[in-house]
From Swiss-Prot:
It catalyses: dTDP-alpha-D-glucose = dTDP-4-dehydro-6-deoxy-alpha-D-glucose + H2O. SUPFAM superfamilies: NAD(P)-binding Rossmann-fold domains. Binds 1 NAD(+) per subunit. Disulfide bonds: none annotated. It comes from Xanthomonas campestris pv. campestris (strain B100). Belongs to the NAD(P)-dependent epimerase/dehydratase family. dTDP-glucose dehydratase subfamily. This is dTDP-glucose 4,6-dehydratase.
Length: 351
């Protein structure tokens, strides 16, 4: 049985990845600091499962990471741990530098030392996979897509911190020979998503009868990737990716933000109509745009398709229907989040 050390495995993408990995017979050591977006309720179905070992801790704690590596002897380390919300990075960039840059460095140092001491056969097979974002590339005009050779041009404190972490991973490969892989993904959506992000925020506010905030004119474009497609892409890169390479992961589903909100409203009108009969779109409220808001992201994932045979299984229409249905049938999970410190408020609106 393979063993993977997964960092950030109680978050949105990491949590979905851990659930799928354990179901596929992987033994997972899950290291998560359980900051505001980490949620053990996401992993409730794994309680008592011997193949899931949860450890509360920070990737910046080199001694802890070293102990876990020595104790569990993983065949791969997958780094999902990150502060990831652009609005929060505008309000408080320091936490993003600490986790995404300093934390990644500490993790890399511990993993490098562990990898160097492995027997030859295990050392050759070992992989460090770093999960990153398309936001490191900056913004696009009306045409074109990000490729793996697009120059980095991050525009927010969040994307700058992720760009720095990507560069550290690359440097540890070229300097020390660490067998790394990097994935840069587009906007994810799906189950277990913390409701500060657009899709779960709109669902929660719509059900609460609150205004649905749309930044600026709502015509910012994002490529939307269903989270289970992303998890499959990561497993594919881990199994077949070329060491030292970067792979873009996209859903081939470009949508304006306002189109996403309208799609959610239509699904809620169908499955959970308002008592007064009004359409959910009547709750849409245009608000001041995010400072420095990137206009358009679009991913060219042809390298991943051509080299490794991966492509998304879900269209946006399929994925958003599954997502809305999940939130409607899992309100206990949502309420558990909203009973904490987060109350669907906007942050990072001013500089």
């Amino acid at each position: 049985m393979a063993t993977w050390l997964v960092t950030g495995g109680a978050g949105f993408i990491g949590g979905n990845f851990v659930l799928e990995a354990v179901s596929r017979g992987i033994r997972v050591v899950n290291l998560d600091a359980l900051t505001y977006a980490g949620n053990l309720n996401t992993l409730a179905s794994l309680e008592g499962n011997a193949d899931h070992i949860f450890v509360k801790g920070d990737i910046g704690d080199g001694a802890l990471v070293t102990r876990l590596l020595q104790e569990h002897q993983p065949d791969a380390v997958l780094n999902f741990a990150a502060e990831s919300h652009v609005d929060r990075s505008i309000e408080g960039p320091g936490a993003f530098i600490q986790t995404n840059v300093v934390g990644t460095l500490a993790l890399l140092e511990a993993v490098r030392d562990y990898w160097k001491a492995l027997p030859d056969t295990r050392r050759d097979a070992f992989r460090f996979l770093h999960v990153s974002t398309d936001e490191v590339y900056g913004t696009l005009g009306e045409t074109g897509k990000f490729t793996e050779t697009t120059p980095y041009a991050p525009n927010s404190p969040y994307s700058a911190s992720k760009a720095a972490s990507d560069h550290l991973v690359r440097a540890f490969h070229h300097t020390y020979g660490l067998p790394v892989l990097t994935t840069n993904c587009s906007n994810n959506y799906g189950p277990y998503h913390f409701p500060e992000k657009l899709i779960p925020l709109v669902i929660a506010k719509a059900l609460a009868g609150e205004p649905l905030p749309v930044y600026g004119d709502g015509k910012q474009v994002r490529d939307w990737l269903f989270v289970s497609d992303h998890c499959e892409a990561i497993r594919t890169v881990l199994a077949k990716g070329r060491v030292g390479e970067t792979y873009n992961v996209g859903g081939n589903s470009e949508r304006q933000n306002i189109e996403v909100v309208q799609a959610i409203c239509a699904l809620l009108d169908q499955h959970r109509p308002r008592e007064d009969g009004k359409p959910r779109e009547s709750q849409i409220a245009y608000v001041t745009d995010r400072p420095g808001h990137d206009r358009r992201y679009a991913i060219d994932a042809s390298k991943l398709k051509d080299e490794l045979g991966w492509e998304p299984a879900y269209t946006f229409e399929q994925g958003i229907a599954l997502t809305v249905d999940w939130y409607l049938t899992n309100q206990t999970w949502v309420q558990g989040v909203l009973d904490g410190s987060y109350r669907l408020e906007r942050i990072g609106a001013t500089v």
